[in-house]
Amino acid sequence: MPVKFGKVLIPQPRSKFVKIRCPDCGNEQVTFSHAAMVVRCLVCGRVLAQPTGGKAKFAGHIVKILE
């Protein structure tokens, strides 16, 4: 009988890095999906991510989710 290989039970993290575009100036910036501090745009200073206790609430447009 051949040996059957099951699923490898290695937990994967749910948090990722995301690239956000600022709605005011168009600057693209990389931040953490579960940010614990307020993330501001480096060019104009607008708040891009607000911490909520879990995932951050994003004010800008999410351009790409980085792996």
UniProtKB/Swiss-Prot annotation:
Annotated positions binding Zn(2+): 22, 25, 41, 44
Co-factor(s): Zn(2+)
Pfam families, alphabetized: Ribosomal_S27e
Keyword annotations: Metal-binding, Ribonucleoprotein, Ribosomal protein, Zinc, Zinc-finger
Gene Ontology MF terms in the entry: structural constituent of ribosome; zinc ion binding
SUPFAM superfamilies: Zn-binding ribosomal proteins (SSF57829)
Zinc fingers, C4-type class: 22-44
Intrachain disulfide bonds: none
Family from the record: Belongs to the eukaryotic ribosomal protein eS27 family.
Assembly description: Part of the 30S ribosomal subunit.
Protein name as catalogued: Small ribosomal subunit protein eS27
Gene name linked to the record: rps27e
